[in-house]
């Protein structure tokens, strides 16, 4: 068996590892938070929602009676717009053209998929999608994060992920094509002890005295 590593194979491996370790437009990961849940995290400014079927690739695949490409959420600076491609309602009004979303808006897709749009932190453009109906994503998640520059986890209601028992806030920050974690205390990233700030990858585990979260790359 020929096990020679050619330059082409090495390049392909390096590119695959880079995609797995650094967030780029169109990439996604699962953010698992111990004691809280799992959140499908999208890094693109334009996110497509549709039915979860193998023949269609969308950013947020939902198990429900939807069109394959049902709607698009797009971030423009600090504002999010929803663009309907299938029957879509915002605050009980059907829309047929892009509409700006406000924090707390209820979105209905099709006959029964109900979501709530949240933009809880006044200093962050990151948004969260909560499920009001029983429908879930594939892979299953407790919510969807549309990550802009930062994602804040902590005990306050204005955090993107609310973790009531945490003493310190944890902030994930995008820096060009990399991710970093900021915590105002000592914490570990993949077993290495840090304080204040540390780089993380799309497969890192971050742990402190009273918190633990991990990232899982999604192809």
For the regions a language model picked out, list residue spans one by one.
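N-terminal short leaders/motifs
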Residues: 20-36, 57-64, 110, 121-125
């Amino acid at each position: 068996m020929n096990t020679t590593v050619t330059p082409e194979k090495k390049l392909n491996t390096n590119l695959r590892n880079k995609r797995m370790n650094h967030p780029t437009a169109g990439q996604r990961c699962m953010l698992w938070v111990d004691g809280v849940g799992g959140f499908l995290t999208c890094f693109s400014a334009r996110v497509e929602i549709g039915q979860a079927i193998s023949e269609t690739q969308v950013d947020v695949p939902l198990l429900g009676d939807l069109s394959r490409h049902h709607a698009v959420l797009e971030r423009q600076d600090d504002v999010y717009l929803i663009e309907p491609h299938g029957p879509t309602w915002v605050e009980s009004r059907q829309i047929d053209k892009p509409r700006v979303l406000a924090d707390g808006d209820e979105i209905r897709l099709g006959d029964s998929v109900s979501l709530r749009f949240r933009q809880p932190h006044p200093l962050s453009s990151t948004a969260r999608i909560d499920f009001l109906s029983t429908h879930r994503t594939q892979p299953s998640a407790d919510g969807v994060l549309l990550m802009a520059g930062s994602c804040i986890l902590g005990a306050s209601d204005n955090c993107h992920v609310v973790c009531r028992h945490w003493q310190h806030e944890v902030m994930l920050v995008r820096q060009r094509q990399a991710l970093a974690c900021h915590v105002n205390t000592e914490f570990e990233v993949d077993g290495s002890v840090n304080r204040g700030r540390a780089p993380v990858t799309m497969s890192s585990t971050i742990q402190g005295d009273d918190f633990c979260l991990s990232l899982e790359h999604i192809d």
